């Protein structure tokens, strides 16, 4: 790792892990992109294109018709002065103009990585772990300065980027577009990957070739959303899971985002990422500044799996924080699919008794414990215990659960309010709304206005009081609708389009305060399942409920796609009842267990109604998972067979010292007279022998290069899980 500046060539060379990222000051201070890829000693211009006089590409210097910003590979481009591609930023002046011209002013290089004020971001524990470059660009005419921040990590092929706008002039500026990064590739000979989905089928992998024009993944929902995820990748045509070049872009933010690739007339590709400029503006008074969120860029020459492993380790160790970052996560039982709203203290205690018998460690009480919450039509915001259901309160219930040797956890949804609630009747102006318009509801609820400091203060104190009222060690933080009528009664008209981003800043403040007050509590984020599974949430809460769809077969694609970016320690995965409540499928308890044991393991069904056979199998599942939990949650993850490409799925976990591994294989549908097949493993020590429980002892090289035969079985939804241990030689 190093960041170097060569004053003779005016080149910046960032070395991150085994990758190089090179920029150069060009002409009169324009910042050009030169190279990003496998580490090189130096870049002397072997790949530099000749400068040509291109028709309809204007020239900022009329005396040189071979220079146009329209053809320059850039780092943070503007619009309006000869570049017709999508800009990284756009600023409106008081005279209505949106033309700006940023040129190099200065730079500084220093050890470590600064935190972003009020925003989640990756971090370092020691300044030797990374080096940061700040390049200051300025528009002297209007007094605008933009500081581009690049951090290169020593351990990983990781460059993080963000931008800070400062108004050092005398007039008010309005940001219309303020993306976190942009980078131009000299060729568009790539595929691109994004993770589209919907409620119940989040983060499916979609790969397609780049084409001329704009292709994008974005959210305008006020959240990162089920429908898209703040991640894209450029993938070399020949790249697959284990070989080839991949460029990953992941946005550390939980609100509206834009991840865009534009292929221009000359076959170059511009990748841009940041806050979605749709319905966004931000006023910058003289002396004020605006900080964009962070983008984490990963280069891999080891295919998609190489990219994923970098994201996994970085996000697990340098994005997630707190006591649970490195701690094994408990096996839980959640009552939601067992009872929905229809429960009382006796039902929950009975579930806890059975859970203790099975070896489960944590009982989570889901929605319905507060106010008059007998359905989803009332009481959100009234965070007072329903004594009819829980006559001894949360404290009394939690103590009964604790006496059984179990921890107690709780569901909350602090960002929402029901119109039929005491909170709404008292403060109808506390929700997002615009004057004289009806307030649209989703799941019979409205969104609290977290852009307001008084609302955030109220939520911090109210939820803190709840969490302090009982021995609670786990919280599931839910959010069950997206934003409409986005406006705030606390902001003036000219700042209304700041509301969505101010909401996110308020949410991050609330989460930071509450998680800091209760460091002993494991927080799991949720948004109708995986509707806000993003890096921003992981900064405050180290795990996320992956999807409300608990069907084992559906989860193969959901968890496989999620693993493209997010570590296994972040994925909540539960065994639920059959027929499954979301899709009606009936899969065996064995298969449901194997899928759920591929994440943070738990159960979500009425365990008081189990047969003795089911109880015995669950006891075995719980005991087995406890034995492999650290390997699953913190081991190196390899994807082996994609459920998006066929009828099978497989993945494996390998310990850091390669002495132990766990392999999971799944086949969805049976086939008559099916061919025999084998599975090639990954990540083992080629010089080491491994014992596969029940199969024998084999060399790591044989298992990786020749593979292991898959048993022949004739039924739908089958699964196998093999544990490998190195044989002492």
Curated annotation (Swiss-Prot):
InterPro entries: Aldolase_TIM (IPR013785), Alpga-gal_N_sf (IPR038417), Alpha-glycosidase_related (IPR050985), Glyco_hydro_27/36_CS (IPR000111), Glyco_hydro_36 (IPR002252), Glyco_hydro_36_C (IPR031705), Glyco_hydro_36_N (IPR031704), Glyco_hydro_b (IPR013780). Optimum pH is 6.5. Keywords: Carbohydrate metabolism, Glycosidase, Hydrolase. The active site is at residues 478, 548. Optimum temperature is 65 degrees Celsius. Changing residue 336 to N: Very strongly reduced hydrolytic efficiency against raffinose, but displays low level of transglycosylation activity compared to none with wild-type enzyme. Its EC number is 3.2.1.22. Has properties that make it suitable for elimination of D-raffinose from low green syrup in sugar manufacturing process from beets in order to improve the yield of sucrose. One of its GO terms (biological process) is protein homotetramerization. The keyword Translocase does not apply. Not inhibited by D-galactose or sucrose. Inhibited by pharmaceutical drug 1-deoxygalactonojirimycin. One of its GO terms (molecular function) is alpha-galactosidase activity. It catalyses: Hydrolysis of terminal, non-reducing alpha-D-galactose residues in alpha-D-galactosides, including galactose oligosaccharides, galactomannans and galactolipids. It comes from the Bacteria. Substrate binds at residues 53, 199, 366-367, 443, 476-480, 526, 548. Homotetramer. Hydrolyzes the short-chain alpha-galactosaccharides raffinose and stachyose. Belongs to the glycosyl hydrolase 36 family. This is Alpha-galactosidase AgaA. It comes from Geobacillus stearothermophilus (Bacillus stearothermophilus). The gene is agaA.
